[in-house]
């Protein structure tokens, strides 16, 4: 959560949430006044998270962030995507950006965590990885900050407005 500031009361989407680990961290960060939507295309992961998160401020949904998610337009303060962007095709990148823009509030933020583009003990081949500069060029949103996340990851923050 370093680099995101206070999330108290915010509405957050954890896109491609997997088992919901980060969704649970966001749940505590947004508090009772906020809400976390956990989205993943894997039905079994979402069903397990629904059972685990019952009675919390987490709403677990099956869906694909690279297509129309049916989520309400301009409703999210933050969209978070962790270590999956490198696997998107060019069409999926376009779909992802379009859907993120649609569901983010004006001035809302997009946070993408990716693996650094150098040899690491884990992660995809180097030719699949994005440097933070390549990631900034790949999207038309306004880049805000690049934050180191440990030794092997970084988070690129964007604002939901077009680059000048």
Located regions from the model:
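Conserved alpha-helix/loop element of class I SAM-dependent methyltransferases that forms part
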Residues: 1-10, 25
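A short acidic, Gly/Pro-enriched loop at the edge of an enzyme's catalytic core
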Residues: 7, 66-79
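Class I SAM-dependent methyltransferase SAM/SAH-binding core
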Residues: 13, 19-67
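Helix-to-beta-strand junctions that scaffold the AdoMet/dcAdoMet cofactor pocket
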Residues: 30-31, 88-89, 104-106
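A short SAM/SAH-binding and catalytic strip from SAM-dependent methyltransferases
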Residues: 77-91
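A short glycine-rich, Lys/Arg-flanked "PGG" loop and its adjoining helix->strand segment in the class I
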Residues: 94-106
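Conserved beta-strand signature within the Rossmann-like core of class I S-adenosyl-L-methionine
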Residues: 107-114
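Core SAM-dependent methyltransferase catalytic element
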Residues: 147-164
């Amino acid at each position: 959560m370093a680099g995101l500031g206070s999330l108290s009361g915010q509405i957050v989407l954890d896109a491609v949430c997997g088992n919901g680990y980060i969704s649970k961290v966001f749940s505590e960060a947004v508090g009772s006044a906020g809400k976390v939507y956990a989205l993943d295309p894997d039905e079994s992961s979402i069903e397990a998270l629904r059972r685990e998160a019952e009675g919390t401020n987490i709403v677990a949904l099956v869906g694909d962030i690279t297509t129309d998610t049916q989520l309400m337009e301009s409703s999210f303060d933050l969209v978070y995507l962790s270590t999956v962007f490198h696997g998107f095709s060019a069409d999926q990148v376009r779909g992802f950006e379009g859907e993120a823009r649609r569901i983010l509030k004006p001035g809302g933020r997009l946070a993408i965590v990716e693996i650094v583009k150098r040899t690491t003990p884990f992660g995809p081949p180097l030719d699949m990885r994005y440097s933070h500069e390549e990631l900034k060029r790949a999207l038309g949103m306004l880049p805000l900050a690049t934050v180191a996340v440990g030794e092997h990851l970084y988070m690129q923050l964007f604002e939901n407005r077009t680059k000048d």
